A protein has these predicted regions:
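Cell-envelope/extracellular polymer assembly enzymes that use nucleotide-activated donors
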Residues: 4-7, 36, 163
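Short, well-formed alpha-helical segments that are part of the catalytic scaffolds
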Residues: 14-29
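A conserved acidic beta->alpha catalytic loop
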Residues: 39-49, 86
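Glycine-rich, basic loop-to-helix element that forms the pyrophosphate-binding segment
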Residues: 61-77
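Conserved nucleotide-sugar donor-binding
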Residues: 78-79, 136-150
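Short aromatic/hydrophobic "clamp" motif used to bind/position activated sugar donors
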Residues: 82
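Conserved donor NDP-sugar-binding/catalytic core segment of glycosyltransferases
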Residues: 94-125
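C-terminal catalytic/acceptor-binding lobe
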Residues: 152-221
Length: 221
């Protein structure tokens, strides 16, 4: 059975430094039917130049909250599925394939996780577990376009998915963070991640190629 088309949406603001990481996050995906990349950029630095074999819809927009940008991006998508990619995270090759498989096997409309694993500049790792899908990290979400059509993200600067998912938990499934992403902790994170640095270290999934890129842009030692 042929995979249904998936749009990847990327909100960005002054993230030129992360260009090669963003590019590899897209290129490494094992999902077989990526339709397009949709980018909303309200920054004032250079536009991202991504060498990927997919159509790119690059939207230069006025300054917006992250919730407004996610809604703008979703509104422009042509795919059956929408996959979020934030600019400063490692997305594992299995991310979209794993997420879509859960949607199809469990007959759900959205999937994500509130669990997180972290890598800090000094190489220390950390993790955070949260069983509440109402607090799912927006960066991990994959959902049917029709799910967004029914209800949009809150137009806020953070936690915009709480409203998006509220009252729809029965339509939402939980993904495995170690098949989805690794959060990179750095000085310009939207949310400070240092609070979790005291947590026990964890073994991270394999991400050697990503490591090379992170070292090249001085995000890890």
């Amino acid at each position: 059975m042929q995979s249904l088309p998936c749009s990847i949406i990327i909100p960005t603001y002054n993230r030129k430094k992360f260009e090669k990481l963003i590019e590899y996050n897209i290129l490494c995906q094992t999902y077989s039917n990526i339709l397009e990349i949709v980018i909303a950029d309200d920054g004032d630095d250079e536009m991202l130049q991504l060498n990927v074999p997919y159509s790119i819809n690059y939207i230069k927009c006025d300054r917006m909250t992250i919730g407004q940008k996610r809604n703008l991006l979703a509104s422009k998508c042509k795919g059956f599925y929408i996959a979020h990619m934030d600019t400063d995270d490692v997305y594992l090759p299995t991310y979209i394939e794993h997420s879509v498989s859960i949607l199809e096997n469990q007959k759900k409309d959205a999937v994500g996780t509130s669990d997180m694993v972290f890598i800090y500049p000094d190489g220390k790792t950390g993790s955070m577990r949260n069983p509440l899908l109402s607090m799912a990290n927006e960066a991990t979400l994959v959902y049917k376009k029709s799910f967004w059509d029914e209800k949009h993200f809150a137009e806020s600067q953070s936690s915009e998915a709480i409203y998006f998912l509220k009252g729809r938990h029965w339509q939402t499934a939980h993904s495995d963070i170690k098949k989805v992403m690794i959060c990179i902790c750095h000085s310009t994170n939207t949310v400070d991640k240092n609070v979790w640095k005291t947590c026990p270290e964890v073994e991270l999934p394999y991400y050697e190629k990503h490591k090379e890129i992170l070292r090249a842009i001085n995000l890890i030692s």
